[in-house]
């Protein structure tokens, strides 16, 4: 879908849950829709980093895995917008306003896409793991050393070492604990930054927690990790343990990347400022989900759904001033 000047009503940048709900709502408004996603599939962070994680704070789902939520969001999007165009493995690097008021989106490979309105639903932006300064661990990346849990069954019956003290590390430890043979969690301090409820679950689990411990090195046979040496950072005393997998859960660093050069008003170099309509400071460009900011903003999947519905409705009014910003309820629309 590159090289043509086919014009879309709205283009969403990012196909996470917020973006997918935006596709659904754009379909409800009869908008010709395109989605550009830097990853090879829909789902954003949930699909790339936490597909096996259970989510508890989405209305209507007491408990749902991230993978299943993404599947449900895509199914919903397809139900209202089956003709939406998805473009994968493309990162939007440039956003240009053309003389006729429409937008040209240029990707990192030079593809050009055209749209009347743009909604940025890119989550936390581009992200990559915070790698620890340990050469032995880097040598075994993908060979037993992981930065996320994307395939839970591979940890079944395994001896797992998890490193970190934030939400990522604690979540990973709790995810693999029911199926792993043994789980050890080490943290360089005695204070954890994870959510209070997660820490309660950790305390009640069979995870071996060792504070003031860090990774010295990992060893293996060249094909897969076999051992890990950890040390007490107060005494320097080393302990070598047998491991089958090492999960480095030290979080991810995110960046807005080239979006910082688009002329958008940015909060703390991390989020795009929007008003109550989801509008940025550039007319016709909106933002929703974790990537947007306004006073009182709460970064939740649930709030992203409401934000993108607001953005889509106002984008519709922007490209078609004669249409209503609020079209009525979905039950009325779908039953016509």
From Swiss-Prot:
Its EC number is 1.18.1.2. Keywords: FAD, Flavoprotein, NADP, Oxidoreductase. FAD binds at residues 18, 37, 45, 50, 92, 127, 290, 331. It comes from the Bacteria. It comes from Symbiobacterium thermophilum (strain DSM 24528 / JCM 14929 / IAM 14863 / T). Homodimer. It is an enzyme of class 1 (oxidoreductase). HAMAP family: FENR2. Its cofactor is FAD. This is Ferredoxin--NADP reductase. InterPro entries: FAD/NAD-bd_sf, FAD/NAD-binding_dom, Fd--NADP_Rdtase_type_2, Ferredoxin-NADP_redctase_2.
């Amino acid at each position: 879908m590159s090289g043509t000047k086919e014009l879309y009503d709205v283009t969403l940048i990012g196909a996470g849950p917020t973006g997918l709900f935006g596709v659904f709502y754009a379909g409800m408004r009869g908008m010709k829709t395109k989605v550009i996603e830097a990853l090879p599939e829909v789902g954003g962070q949930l699909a790339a980093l936490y597909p096996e994680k259970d989510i508890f704070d989405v209305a209507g789902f007491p408990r749902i895995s991230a993978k299943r939520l993404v599947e449900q969001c895509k199914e919903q999007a397809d139900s209202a917008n089956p003709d939406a165009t998805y473009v994968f493995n493309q990162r939007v690097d440039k956003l240009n306003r053309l003389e006729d008021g429409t937008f040209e989106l240029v990707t990192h490979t030079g593809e050009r896409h055209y749209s009347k309105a743009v909604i940025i639903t890119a989550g936390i932006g581009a992200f990559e793991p915070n790698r620890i300064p340990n050469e032995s661990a880097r040598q075994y990346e993908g060979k037993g050393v992981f930065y996320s849990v994307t395939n839970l069954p591979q940890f079944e019956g395994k001896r797992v070492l998890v490193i970190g003290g934030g939400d990522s590390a604690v979540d990973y430890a709790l995810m693999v604990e029911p199926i792993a043979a043994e789980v050890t969690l080490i943290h360089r301090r005695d204070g954890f930054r994870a959510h209070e409820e997660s820490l309660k679950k950790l305390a009640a689990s069979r995870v071996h927690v060792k504070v003031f411990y860090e990774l010295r090195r990992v060893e293996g046979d060249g094909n897969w990790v076999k051992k890990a040496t950890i040390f007490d950072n107060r005494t320097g005393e080393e302990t070598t343990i047998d491991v089958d997998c090492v999960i480095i859960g030290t979080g991810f660093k995110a960046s807005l990347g080239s979006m910082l050069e688009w002329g958008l008003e940015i909060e703390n170099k991390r989020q795009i400022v929007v008003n109550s309509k989801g509008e940025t400071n550039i007319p016709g460009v909106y933002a929703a989900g974790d990537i947007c900011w306004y006073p009182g903003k709460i970064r939740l999947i649930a709030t992203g759904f409401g934000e993108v519905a607001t953005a889509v409705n106002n984008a519709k009014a922007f490209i078609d001033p004669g249409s209503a910003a609020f079209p009525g309820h979905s039950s009325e629309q779908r039953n016509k």
